[in-house]
Amino acid sequence: MFCSISGETPKEPVISRVSGNVYEKRLIEQVIRETSKDPVTQQECTLEDLVPVKVPDFVRPRPPSATSLPALLSLFQEEWDSVALEQFELRRNLTETKQELSTALYSLDAALRVISRLTKERDEAREALAKFSDNIGTVSSKTIEVQEVEMGESDDQLKTSLRSTVEKTFQELSSKRKRTKLQPKWATDDAVSQLLQATPSTILENLETESTTSFFPSPENSSFVLCLHKDELLCLDIQSNSTLKIFEGSALACCWLTSSKIAVATADAISIFEFPVSSSGLQSVGEPTSSIPIDEKVNFLQAHPSGEYLLAASNEKCYIFSLKSQVYNITVAQHITSLAVHPDGNLFVAGLENGELRFFETSSGNELTKFGPHSSPVKTLQFGENGYWLVVTTNDDSDIFIWDLRKSELVQKIPLQTKVAAVSLDITSQLLVSSDGETLYVHIYVKSSKSWRCMSQTHVSSISNLVWLNELHQLLFSTSNGAILRLG
């Protein structure tokens, strides 16, 4: 008997009642399930129409291909070829798997190295901040002189409120700095070169050439910049190249308290103004919301990061004011030539005519330490946003001095060709732009060598002051010719 479908001897023969043909049981059942018909006659057929055939057990005959030696050799050759092909495929798969595993191991090793480096940098930063906190909290009797600190009225209440605000602000900002790692994504040689090759656009011109110009970008939107030229206070809208005179009197100093509030110092008072700025443009400033009377002319004015206090300096005194009254003043036995507040707000530094830098605790007015002296009067001071760098320039030196507050030492001098005219450190503390009046320099901090590398030197003459506009990736500078220009 042979199966009508396969033509081979069936193992389980059955006969179809419909056609009378013999089939292999598994084959005919599959056909009926799919078509419900007999495969030979195409008549309707069900599984009940299949009748099993009982036959004695027998040895199935060999197929024709295995009945002769040549046929067997051919069969063996085919089997060998199949084994060889399968072995080749297995070897190829093994090679690919090894390559994938090797790539994965290299990627894992690189990831572990990056994690290790980042962990090390994090630990170094934490250790540096801890050392810095210890340094500013330790008062050395050999280096600290007793200062005359005069408190205002209601001493206890003022001191408690000031201390609480300073400590709260310090905790918030220092912890935020530990979590946030700022990187200048645009600080590449090509990007800086493209910035410096741009044609400067004029925002303002025909200013008095004998007076200096100071810039104060808004803390949240550097498109708006306060500009103090002589005793005239303007606000510059960088995006639209427009200006607005926001104060009619003679301004001696100014600063932003918040993005919508400014402080302006005159000869007899410090006035607080609401000054909302938005994308719709500049708005006029109304009457001051509060006014603080002062006894001496204020040369420098800085806002505490909380926006609730002001730090000021006259010729020989440093002051702290709330937005309503004076909290205390410190008498310094030297002429004060510059003032800067730490980004965390827990201390401030005064640059003196004798070249010294004196650090004071904001909450109490106690002197913490002093650096220097430099060889000439301190000209400008700027803390880095990383919390531990202090950039210093002097009147007569051609070097920019970088102090490290963690180590309480001068870590680097950046030389220029002639006396430093202006300097500005960007928000990442990794880009430093400066000018000696004839050349514009851009330096970048290289962490591997812990030094500053000069990225570019561009001839831009007559620069008297400059500042980074961080969000815009632009530079704003004034010239001795009485113009204010934007680069980028």
UniProtKB/Swiss-Prot annotation:
Assembly mode: Homotetramer. Component of the NTC complex (or PRP19-associated complex), composed of at least CEF1, CLF1, ISY1, NTC20, SNT309, SYF1, SYF2, and PRP19.
Keyword vocabulary terms for this entry: DNA damage, DNA repair, mRNA processing, mRNA splicing, Nucleus, Repeat, Spliceosome, Transferase, Ubl conjugation pathway, WD repeat
Localization terms from the record: Nucleus
Similarity section: Belongs to the WD repeat PRP19 family.
Keyword rRNA processing: no
WD repeats: from-to residues: 331-370, 373-413
Pfam families given in the database record: ANAPC4_WD40 (PF12894), Prp19 (PF08606)
EC number: 2.3.2.27
Function, in words: Probable ubiquitin-protein ligase involved in pre-mRNA splicing. May also function in DNA repair.
Name of the protein described by the UniProt record: Pre-mRNA-processing factor 19
A biological-process GO annotation: mRNA cis splicing, via spliceosome
UniProt KW Secreted keyword: no
GO molecular function, one term: ubiquitin-protein transferase activity
Lineage: Eukaryota, Fungi, Dikarya, Ascomycota, Taphrinomycotina
Pathway(s) of this molecule: Protein modification; protein ubiquitination
Reaction(s) this enzyme catalyzes, per UniProt: S-ubiquitinyl-[E2 ubiquitin-conjugating enzyme]-L-cysteine + [acceptor protein]-L-lysine = [E2 ubiquitin-conjugating enzyme]-L-cysteine + N(6)-ubiquitinyl-[acceptor protein]-L-lysine
Gene name linked to the record: prp19
Gene3D superfamilies assigned to the protein according to its UniProt record, in alphabetical order: YVTN repeat-like/Quinoprotein amine dehydrogenase, Zinc/RING finger domain, C3HC4 (zinc finger)
SUPFAM superfamilies from the UniProt entry: RING/U-box, WD40 repeat-like
UniProt xrefs under PANTHER family: PRE-MRNA-PROCESSING FACTOR 19
U-box domain sequence ranges: 1-71
GO cellular component, one term: post-mRNA release spliceosomal complex
